[in-house]
Amino acid sequence: MAGTDHSRPAASGGPAIILVEPQLGENIGTAARAMANCGLDDLRLVCPRDGWPSDKAVAAASGADFVLDKARLYPSVAAAIGDLVHVYAATARDRYMVKRELTPRRAAEEMRGFLSLGEACGVLFGPERMGLVNDKLRSPIRCSACRSTPPSPRSTSPRRCC
């Protein structure tokens, strides 16, 4: 039988996903949907531009309401990551910082190991238009730059802060 089986409990665990200043409710909803597909349910929002909660996020979540229902709102990155032991920042460009750079695969392997030890982890994403600025990466002392490889140079946010 194809489709989602809503009678089964949702999986939980894995890293927290932290969206910093997300710009559109639809993007929050699609992030929640991707999280649900991967068995993640800890969504943290830092100062969403269009406020929270969002009807547009619910519409875009396509059944991942349980992720949105648990989503928590934070006033700062520091508050959003305060309970996490390891934080990885996703960025598509060089940051010229003294931070370890990991491939997404290596970061996932590390997180899996830390989570198995009971150490809370999170992945930090910046605003859609500009990405994470260096100040957001410096503020969390535990933050390692997890450099992603976009499918096309056209898909990265503009260079503004580096």
Q: Where are the model-predicted features located?
A:
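Post-transcriptional modification and biogenesis factors for structured RNAs
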Residues: M1-C162
